Amino acid sequence: GSLPFSDRAARKVFYTGENQRPDFDETHFAFSFDYSDDSRNYRLPLWMLHLNWFDVPHNEDRDQSYLHSLGDFLDKKIDIDKIRETKKEFCTFISSVAKGRRVDFVPKLHNRYKPIACAGGLFNNIRGKLNGRGDQRWKIEFLNLFKFNISFEHTRHSGYVTEKIIHPMFSNTIPIYWGSRRVEEDFNPKSFINGNKYPNDEELIDVIAKIDSDEDLYISMLNEPWFNNNEIPEHAKPENVMKFFKEKVLA
């Protein structure tokens, strides 16, 4: 919103799920994507909101975001036979926004290697779109069918890591990521394909093709924990978020 800012008024806290910077001339504190030395800012990337940290029961009447329990995310179990049985399709892409590197990359991978199932508004080729907003339960169920998902952000900033990388993880689908160059501080680089590392689309496509065609390499990547050392990043721990609230916002 746009409530008038005043140092004498109640504490104003900025939060965004978009790639925007907090303006501390307009707010007292911020939960943002930013890595910052400013003590008024806490890095709270959007992917954090898509884990069920407290085992809240699922509400079938809502297309809610927190569908996957933290316990299941950490206790990653790979059933190779089930993977072979269910993941018979190569790759999917789900987006309706024609913005960023993905606009060029998706057609290249589709035309130069293998067809991609596009289930959003952009490049749609499945004769329909996913139910709901296409970014929660229906999306995750759809992802179960695929080995890979193109998980490109629509824009890039050092800390801007959204739900795009974590949704395929919920389905044991390998993300093909592009966006934040610091994404490996949030997630284990051995568990996904980091498109930021490759200077051009051709090299990235070669890497994808290699993993897709080598089952041992593919399974090895699937067996990696999603988090580095299978440990929750410090900034993502609920107790540290609450500590910021208590010691900064509520002080």
Feature roles, as predicted:
Residues 1-8, 13, 24-118, 122-154, ...:
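Pol beta-like nucleotidyltransferase catalytic core
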